[in-house]
Amino acid sequence: VEKEELYALDITGAKWRKSSRSLLICVEMAEIAGGAMALRDSKNPEIGDLRFTAEEWSAFRDGVRAGEFG
């Protein structure tokens, strides 16, 4: 899925998940089409989500694993 197509996707049936280690503050994530990911605030899901292509998500995940964000 291309970046410009992500926000046109209907994700009302997405299966959102969050860390089992979280308390009250948490980010939820859902895999959408083609390995793309959507993230939202679990306390305020009505404000919307951020969407990332599979390539963007992979680069972010690799950066976290490599310690690039502190």
Residue ranges and their predicted role:
Residues 1-70:
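Positively charged, low-complexity terminal tracts
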